[in-house]
UniProtKB/Swiss-Prot annotation:
It catalyses: a plastoquinone + NADH + (n+1) H(+)(in) = a plastoquinol + NAD(+) + n H(+)(out); a plastoquinone + NADPH + (n+1) H(+)(in) = a plastoquinol + NADP(+) + n H(+)(out). The chain crosses the membrane at residues 4-24, 37-57, 87-107, 111-131, 134-154, 167-187, 208-228, 242-262, 272-292, 305-325, 330-350, 386-406, 416-436, 462-482, 483-503. This is NAD(P)H-quinone oxidoreductase chain 4, chloroplastic. It comes from Oenothera elata subsp. hookeri (Hooker's evening primrose). The lineage of its organism: Eukaryota, Viridiplantae, Streptophyta, Embryophyta, Tracheophyta. The gene is ndhD. It is a multi-pass membrane protein. It is found in: Plastid, Chloroplast thylakoid membrane. Keywords: Chloroplast, Membrane, NAD, NADP, Plastid, Plastoquinone, Quinone, Thylakoid, Translocase, Transmembrane, Transmembrane helix. InterPro entries: NADH_Q_OxRdtase_chain4, NADH_Q_OxRdtase_chainM/4, NADH_UbQ_OxRdtase, ND/Mrp_TM.
């Protein structure tokens, strides 16, 4: 066990310091915003320092472990630790939350509560990624939903209450299945509950029972990821939420579902995952084409970007179902890549709304001349979304593509068919991305504003946009920068997966 509680400090620091926001002067919006931004920067620096000096990339085992008895009656532990699978999402969480705080600078109504909720969400997300106890994972998963619901219901469009209610109904429904799975696995075959990830990874279950557990976890993670048909909350939520909240949803929240699918379904329930992986690949391929086909019909700019996110999540599902090193590495890279791309697209959509007060594409047009900086940034990021070579999306999708082709589990013809469907999805992506750019920036000026003059992106907005763009370019040019974090862990997961399958067959 680690002698110094680095991870505990990283998890509790945002919410503890964030609670002091309410002690600041009520009208001191600027002081409070700088205070929140400083907390996020300090947290990101602390996380980076801890991982740089106390984490070994070539070690696939859990590191920086902390294990404290919490509730004696239930034998419940505060158990934290990180490995190659969780380090990337934790760093992504810190980076996106810091920029989302800067993006939320224009928020003035109930600003104290808004920024506190962002910091509470920050703690919940890092806690979910670093939990090594199944019940602690569930508690962090649920805790994170509270600030998200409040952010959705209090700040946003006219239908924000409807979208927030829809979000909480979907996620709470999924959480019921998550809790059943957690209790079922923890209480199975033992007088005392066993909730330690390391212990559960070596636990064996009857196939029928393992399938039941798997389905419960799959439903919970399918809502968050989202996987069709559990996706309908996402376009409504993104369409109404404030764009800084959208950055957190697209950049981090969706990735929690993918993380849980690998961490729990694949690592703890390998035999059921082997049975369900062909279905995951089929659903992933359908999702890519379905969302890419639906996106062009969305006139709401943020809803169109939301459907593009659903399409990109299909590649993550296929990578997880490919049962290959290459495919799983591609899925993890897509988690990080889309975190940057999705957050950047929603940020730029929000900044354009701040200027023209329009969200529907059929009301826009001719914005390239008055807003050249916004036009340039959104064009580059749309290219990243459609997986232009040299940008991060291309490498991630290519790895998933090769992962399914080289997988040893599937026959040749099904692999060719899935690859063909993925290729169709890749062809459909430029249609909705480029048509979005055409409707926004080219053609006639459809917004009739007398003596119009719009301010282009300012220094703050350019800083946020460029900060999100640089990692996208960096990963596209040198993907090993991210892959080196997870490659050893992915190899260990795949090796343990196939060892468990072979061992089960021998029994």
């Amino acid at each position: 066990m680690n002698s110094f509680p680095w991870l505990t400090i990283i998890v509790v620091f945002p919410i503890l310091t964030g609670s002091l926001i309410f002690l600041l002067p009520h009208r001191g919006n600027k002081v409070m915003k700088w205070y929140t931004l400083c907390i996020c920067i300090l947290e990101l620096l602390l996380t980076t320092y801890t991982f740089c000096y106390h984490f070994q990339l070539d070690d696939p085992l859990t590191q920086l472990t902390e294990n404290y008895k919490w509730i004696h009656f239930f034998d419940f532990y505060w158990r934290l630790g990180i490995d190659g699978l969780s380090i990337g999402p934790i760093l992504l969480t810190g980076f996106i939350t810091t920029l989302a705080t800067l993006a939320a600078w224009p928020v003035t109504r109930d600003a104290q509560l808004f920024h506190f909720l962002m910091l509470a969400m920050y703690s919940g997300q890092i806690g979910s990624f670093s939990s090594r106890d199944l019940l602690l994972f569930f508690l962090m998963w649920e805790f994170e939903l509270i600030p998200v619901y409040l952010l959705l219901s209090m700040w946003g469009g006219k239908k924000r209450l409807y979208s927030a209610t829809k979000f909480i109904l979907y996620t709470a429904g999924g959480s019921i299945f998550l809790l059943i799975g957690v209790l079922g696995i923890g209480l199975y075959g033992s007088n005392e509950p066993t909730l330690n990830f390391e212990t559960l990874a070596n636990q064996s279950y009857p196939v029928a029972l393992e399938v039941i557990f798997y389905v419960g976890f799959l439903i919970a993670f399918a809502v968050k990821l989202p996987i069709i048909p559990f996706h309908t909350w996402l376009p409504d939520t993104h369409g109404e939420a404030h764009y800084s909240t959208c950055m957190l949803l697209a950049g981090i929240l969706l990735k929690m579902g993918a993380y849980g699918l690998v961490r729990i379904n694949m690592e703890l329930l390998p035999h059921a995952h082997c049975l369900f992986s062909p279905g995951l690949i089929i659903v992933g391929a359908i999702q890519i084409i379905y969302a890419a086909s639906t996106s062009p019909g969305q006139l709401n700019l943020k809803k169109r970007i939301a459907y593009s996110s659903i399409s990109h999540m299909g590649f993550i599902i296929i990578g997880i179902g490919s049962l290959s090193d290459t495919g799983l590495n591609g899925a993890i890279l897509q988690i990080i890549s889309h975190g940057f791309i999705g957050a950047a697209l929603f940020f730029l959509a929000g900044t354009s709304y701040d200027r023209i007060r329009l969200l529907y594409l059929d009301e826009m047009g001719g914005m390239a001349i008055p807003l050249p900086k916004l036009f340039t940034m959104l064009s580059i990021l749309s290219m990243a979304s459609l997986a232009l070579p040299g940008l991060s999306g291309f490498v991630a999708e290519l790895l998933v593509f090769f992962g399914i082709i080289t997988s040893q589990k599937y026959l040749l013809m099904p692999k060719i068919l899935i690859a063909f469907l993925m290729a169709i999805g890749m062809i459909l992506t430029p249609i909705y991305s480029l048509s979005m750019l055409r409707q926004m920036f080219y053609g006639y000026k459809l917004f009739n504003v007398p003596n119009y003059y719009f301010f282009d992106s300012g220094p703050r907005e350019l800083f946020v946009s460029i900060s999100l763009l640089l990692p996208i370019i960096g990963i596209g040019i040198y993907p090993d920068f991210v892959l080196s974090l997870s490659v050893e862990k992915v190899e260990a997961i795949i090796s343990h997966f196939f060892f468990s399958i072979v061992f089960k067959k021998k029994e």
